[in-house]
Design a protein with these regions (language model features):
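An N-terminal, globular interaction/scaffold subdomain
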Residues: 45-68, 85
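Glycine-rich, proline-tolerant flexible connector loops at the mouths of alpha/beta enzymes
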Residues: 34-50, 219
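Histidine-acidic metal/acid-base catalytic patches
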Residues: 1-6, 11-13, 54-57, 74-78, ...
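Conserved beta-strand edge residues that scaffold enzyme active sites
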Residues: 36-37, 70, 110-111, 214, ...
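Acidic/aromatic-lined carbohydrate-recognition and catalytic surfaces
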Residues: 65-99, 103-123, 127, 134-145
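Catalytic domains of carbohydrate-active enzymes, especially glycoside hydrolases
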Residues: 13-36, 55-59, 95-104
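Extended, charge-rich helix/loop segments that form flexible
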Residues: 111-114, 118-188
Length: 366
């Protein structure tokens, strides 16, 4: 069975792209979804899941991958209340298993999710893309939060990990995380996963951690999943087939020293979900997200896809952040999640995959 192509969808009324639009993209079989109205720590109830399931199944898609069931801060910090939220997370897993969910993507980044300094940065050809200016990410987390919040308020659009409810409590959160060292965060992640694994085995669901984005500490907050060494540590720390990776090529390659294809070859059996994203690097450490075509960035998309193909990857894959094209912009497009560039990216990925299939067939014929 080949890899299964997915598309991240933010839901009716929350995403300008419809399921009807997605149905017209060749090769997409899986909708990557979530209950985006739920706060970390809340239980996803069966009736809430059923509503989304009915929408997705009406168009013939599966809903095997959830991105994300976010982790409550008390779990990451290691507070005594974490056990209550872990029990809620277990119930989410049980409820999701009733609908055939196979993979839960999540992250363990303190306070912030993925971080960029410009959500619609001109890239020179008329399109825009997510951009990271390294010298803007210093100690002033408030300026960054205000930028994101000004966008969400103006366009009535929220981002996972940057919810207004969380941003209103930033000072409290930074105080709560102050004692949490990198080693303590590792300990808290291990505690969380060891508590979940029996439920994951019972429900046949894989927990697939997303790489930290970008892969270095920001605002004094530790990041864990940043390179090959940390991935080795993570997988050996809880050595269970249900403890897996969401391997994001763009998150890792924001650091050009990371060889994503090598990581794929080493850990393919523990990659449940793959994100394919291309990055263009600047000499000063800034980076811009780029089109998926290999030559448009320095991530090595062809070699990454070849690594997955050589390993016989049968998991789920999706195009990650794309550019905004053809009149897409603030107000009608989620940053990084436009319709056109991701659709183009899928066709590029499938074209490379089909060629690799054909080369294998010809090799077998001799």
């Amino acid at each position: 069975m080949p890899m299964k192509m997915g598309w991240r969808w933010y839901g009716e009324g929350n995403d300008p792209i419809t399921l009807s639009d997605i149905k017209q993209i060749p090769g997409v079989t899986s909708i990557v979804w979530a209950l985006h109205n739920k706060m970390p720590g809340e239980i996803w109830e069966v009736d809430e899941i059923q509503k989304v399931a009915d929408q997705i199944h009406a168009y013939g898609f599966d809903m095997d991958v959830v991105e994300s069931v976010n982790v409550h801060d008390d779990i990451k910090i290691g507070l005594p209340t974490r056990d209550k939220y872990i029990e809620n997370y277990k119930q989410c897993i049980r409820n999701l298993s009733k609908f055939g969910v196979k993979v839960i993507c999540y992250n363990f980044m303190p306070i912030f999710d993925w971080t960029r300094t410009d959500l619609f940065h001109p890239v020179g050809d008329g399109s825009t893309a997510l951009f990271y200016q390294k010298d803007m990410i210093q100690d002033d987390y408030k300026a960054m939060a205000e930028y994101i919040m000004s966008f969400t308020e103006k366009y009535n659009m929220t981002f996972p990990g940057w919810e207004p409810e969380r941003m209103a409590k930033l000072d409290e959160l930074f105080k709560a995380y102050a004692p949490v060292t990198k080693e303590k965060l590792w300990e808290n992640l291990k505690y969380f996963l060891e508590a979940l694994m029996p439920t994951c085995r019972e429900c046949d669901i894989k927990m697939a951690i997303h790489m930290d984005d970008p892969p270095w500490d920001i605002f004094g907050l530790p990041r864990l999943l940043v390179d090959a060494e940390s991935i080795d540590r993570f997988l050996s720390m809880v050595d269970d087939e249900n403890n897996c990776l969401t391997l994001c090529s763009g998150s890792l390659n924001a650091n050009p020293n990371n060889n994503v294809a090598e990581i794929v070859r080493k850990h393919c059996d523990r990659i449940a979900f793959a994100h394919i994203r291309n990055i263009h690097h600047f000499p000063n450490g800034d980076f811009s997200e780029a089109a998926h075509r290999d030559c448009c960035g320095e991530t090595g998309i062809i070699e990454i896809l070849r690594a997955y193909h050589d390993c016989g990857f049968e998991g789920y894959i999706r195009p990650d952040h794309g550019r905004q094209l053809w009149e897409e912009g603030p107000g009608n497009c989620r940053p990084g999640y436009g319709k056109y560039d991701r659709a183009l990216g899928i066709q590029y990925m499938l074209g490379v995959w089909d060629l690799l299939d054909r080369l294998d067939e010809e090799k077998k014929k001799g």
